[in-house]
Structure formats: structure tokens, C-alpha cells
């Protein structure tokens, strides 16, 4: 299911969290209908999705603003602010990464700096897949692989960093409970069951960020294994049973979907996204021809 990307200014990238949820509901219902699988046979499900996006909810659980997603580049000043307050080396020692515009923390500080009225109303911060989880279960939860990309997690110890949050004056109550990827975080709510066709007895586990989930699916779950993906972004991903942090912050280190393990990644943000931009801006005739033939351009 394709949904819009909003770019109100050059270098900005936003999506509506509601679009993700509606896409998830439609897809789940379609899969159950076409497969003929009895809902009672769906014992559990895990959730995966794009990482780093900032979803802000008010006290009633309503979305406060469109999500600033992973490829948004507006937060360079906030990255400098983080390094100035925390120190680059200390930040890497805690989060295993330097401050980056793609990560959630700098996006949160941008909202605090530029949209204080929105920040003041915020009571919950979620990642994209975890917003879908919340809508399916009513639970505010995340898991270690995706939380690693928020830049508020103590990656070596797999928990929120109280030290970092205190230094940046961020209320820890805004953050969801952190689980391991394989742990149960809740079950399908009555409302979501009616919309999706799933059973209320279906358990929902932590799941993983997109590439961490792909690693499990491709068997990259032990030392010496790696893979490369070309999706919206491009990634080279390697599993490690021992924590490995680049002190210069040249590659990402995140908690792995496998409990007690981590992974390192090299990333380029513009792979498939660049191809989509080229298609949408320079291939209009080809898109029209594909539509006439009933093909995906």
C-alpha cells in the first residue's frame, strides 16, 4: 500500500501516522480474506516498519502533528545542540552513535525549539511501527532494535538512558516501555479485531525495526553473517554477539532483534527513494503507460 510523503519545505519529509494504520488494517484484512486462514489460527504477530520517525500523541492518544520521518534533514542545529550539551564522545558511548538528523532525538528537540505549543501537549512519543501497535492493542510499547534508533536508548545496556534524558531535560514518562523483540507487548483490541478480522486472542510481540526484522528473516542472526538491502535507503548490515561501537561514529550500532546481541550498519539514505523521485519527476509518460497496462511503474 502506497501512501503520501509530504515535503512542505526543501529537506523536510513527513507522513501522517493515520495513513500507516489504515494501510496496516487494509493489508491484514486482505491477507486474511485471500488466504482463507482462520483468525483463531493466528496465534501471534510481530510488527516491523520504518525506523526513527517521530510520532507525538496528546493525553487522549491523538496525533499532534504529522510524523517527521527518518529521511527528514531539518535538524542540523539540534544535532549541534545535542553534541554541545552531551558531548560527542559521551553520546557515542551511551547511544553508540553521534547525533544525526535522521534519528528521533534531534526531531524531538526541533519540535521543542520550533513548535513549543505542540511539545507542551505531548504525553507520548512513539516510533512509526509502535504507533500501529498502539492502534492495534492500546499499549504504549517499543522494542530494543527500533528504540536504538531514537538516540535515547542506552544501547550497551538495552534501556532508556536516564543520564541522557536528564541532560537534555526530556521527561522519561514520554517514552514507551522497552521490550526485547520476542517479548509479548499486548494483544489485539476489540476495536482492532473488528477492523482487521484478527482475533482478540492474537498476541502482539515486540517485533523489530525494518532491517533488524529483515536480518531475522534472512538468517543473519549469528556472528559472521551479513546482508545488503536496497530499499528506500541502502544498508549493509552485520550481526555481532559482542557489543562493537565505532568511537568515531562512522557506522551505526543498534541492539539486535536477537536478545543479547547487536548489529552494525552502514547506511545511505537515498537509494530507492532517489529512484522514486526520478520516476515521479521525469517518467510521467512511462507512469501513464504503465497505468493503462495495469502495471506498477
Language-model-derived ranges and their functions:
Residues 1-2, 70, 147, 269:
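A generic structural motif
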Residues 1-65, 93, 121, 176, ...:
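N-terminal glycine/serine-rich phosphate-binding loop of ATP-dependent small-molecule kinases
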Residues 3, 180, 256:
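Active-site donor-binding loop signature of nucleotide-sugar glycosyltransferases
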Residues 33-70, 98-104, 133-154, 177-180, ...:
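Short beta-strand-loop/turn "lid" adjacent to the catalytic site in phosphate-handling enzymes
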Residues 55-57, 80, 275:
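A short local structural element in Rossmann-fold oxidoreductases
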